[in-house]
Amino acid sequence: MSSLADTIHIENVVASSDLGQELALDQLATDLDGAEYNPEDFPGVVYRLQEPKSATLIFRSGKVVCTGAKSVDAVHDALEIVFDDLRELGIDVDSTPPVKVQNIVSSASLEQSLNLNAIAIGLGLEQIEYEPEQFPGLVYRLDDPDVVVLLFGSGKLVITGAAESADAQHALAHVNDRLTELGLLE
């Protein structure tokens, strides 16, 4: 059996930055090759990169949000490409704008089926939500790390709200330890 940590895969990293200036989005969408701007549908320019695969949302306020990257390094690389492209258009972008990772979404597996009804009872109602008629997963809110773990009957997990990659490992270890303590894992 592999280490549980080996089952963790980052699915999405969301990071933000601020250019510290207002942007003319109509002009930006025209000048930025491949950018999409439909203000009736969404208030920002959507700028997609193929490598690293990501989408960057650029707002009039100068705020920038990058999503879709599969690693923290990739989100930083994507934003650096976006910043370089903006500089090429004559937009004054700091040499190293601050980038803040907002959310890392990971998937993982406990490598066995789970009895979500028993888990809901064992963990108690204070930290969980489980309404299988509305959603097939059990929602487990952790305080440390401050993440939300979705547990599914298949043993698969989704960990969201992480600020750094290690949070997913800590969350997976916590869930595994807690379910083992409760006698709910083989």
Curated annotation (Swiss-Prot):
Query: Does the entry feature the keyword ATP-binding, yes or no?
Result: no
> In which ranges do the sequence repeats occur?
10-86, 101-179
GO terms classed as biological process = DNA-templated transcription initiation
A Gene Ontology molecular function term of the record = general transcription initiation factor activity
Query: Coiled-coil intervals in this record?
Result: none
Keywords linked to the UniProt accession? DNA-binding, Plasmid, Repeat, Transcription, Transcription regulation
InterPro entries, from UniProt? TBP (IPR000814), TBP_archaea (IPR033711), TBP_CS (IPR030491), TBP_dom_sf (IPR012295)
Which Pfam families did the record assign?
Answer: TBP (PF00352)
What family does the Swiss-Prot or TrEMBL record give for this protein? Belongs to the TBP family.
Under the heading PANTHER family, the entry gives: TATA-BOX BINDING PROTEIN
What HAMAP family is this protein classified in? TATA_bind_prot_arch (MF_00408)
Stated role: General factor that plays a role in the activation of archaeal genes transcribed by RNA polymerase. Binds specifically to the TATA box promoter element which lies close to the position of transcription initiation.
This protein is called: TATA-box-binding protein F
Q: Which organism is it from?
A: Halobacterium salinarum (strain ATCC 700922 / JCM 11081 / NRC-1)
Upper taxonomic lineage: Archaea, Methanobacteriati, Methanobacteriota, Stenosarchaea group, Halobacteria
